[in-house]
């Protein structure tokens, strides 16, 4: 396929893509990773999460993953820093009774000391001192992060040989 044809395809796909939060269902079946992860982040959380526990999701995106956990809304809190997602969370999470607050995961969290049993963070920034501060004694922090080598082949296809973004 010629470069112009590819660009035309990408432009058509971009014009119909409706990205809200972290919902990328519009690319379902069009892109797959070469290897599956050797763990299931959702299952790990659900192994620890009990209905009576207070849960905080830092950098929730649009809240899609958080809602998939089906945790009691009155025991659920979330933060997000990206302005379009903040608005989306206000429209979707607040009406459900979820305690949503705008805030950046790497800064001071807008919650009291020792408030949460479980804090989760999927691919977002976080401040370990703040997580320690808001977790109850014996609380659990569960995170899934992206490494410098993730999708390296795709990065090099698009950008050529580049330095790793971090060690």
Pin down the residues of each PLM region.
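N-terminal, positively charged/glycine-rich alpha-helical extensions of SAM-dependent methyltransferases
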Residues: 1-26
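Conserved class I S-adenosyl-L-methionine
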Residues: 140-167
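Class I SAM-dependent methyltransferase SAM/SAH-binding core
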Residues: 54-108
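Residues lining the SAM
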Residues: 117, 122, 144
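A short acidic, Gly/Pro-enriched loop at the edge of an enzyme's catalytic core
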Residues: 108-118
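Conserved alpha-helix/loop element of class I SAM-dependent methyltransferases that forms part
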Residues: 24, 32-54, 64-65
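A short glycine-rich, Lys/Arg-flanked "PGG" loop and its adjoining helix->strand segment in the class I
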Residues: 126-142
């Amino acid at each position: 396929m010629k470069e112009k044809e590819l660009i035309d395809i990408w432009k058509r796909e971009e014009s119909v893509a409706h990205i809200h939060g972290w919902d990328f269902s519009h690319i379902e079946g069009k892109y797959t990773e070469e290897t599956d992860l050797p763990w299931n982040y959702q299952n790990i959380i659900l192994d620890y999460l009990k209905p009576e526990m207070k849960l905080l999701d830092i950098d929730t995106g649009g809240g899609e993953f958080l809602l998939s956990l089906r945790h009691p809304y009155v025991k659920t809190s979330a933060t997000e820093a990206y302005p379009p997602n903040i608005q989306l969370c206000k429209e979707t999470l607040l009406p459900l009774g979820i305690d949503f607050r705008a805030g950046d995961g790497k800064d001071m969290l807008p919650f009291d000391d020792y408030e949460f049993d479980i804090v989760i963070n999927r691919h977002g920034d976080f401040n370990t001192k703040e997580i320690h501060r808001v977790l109850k004694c014996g609380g659990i922090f569960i995170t899934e992060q992206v490494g410098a080598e993730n999708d390296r082949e795709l990065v090099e296809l698009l950008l050529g040989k580049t330095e790793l973004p971090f060690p």
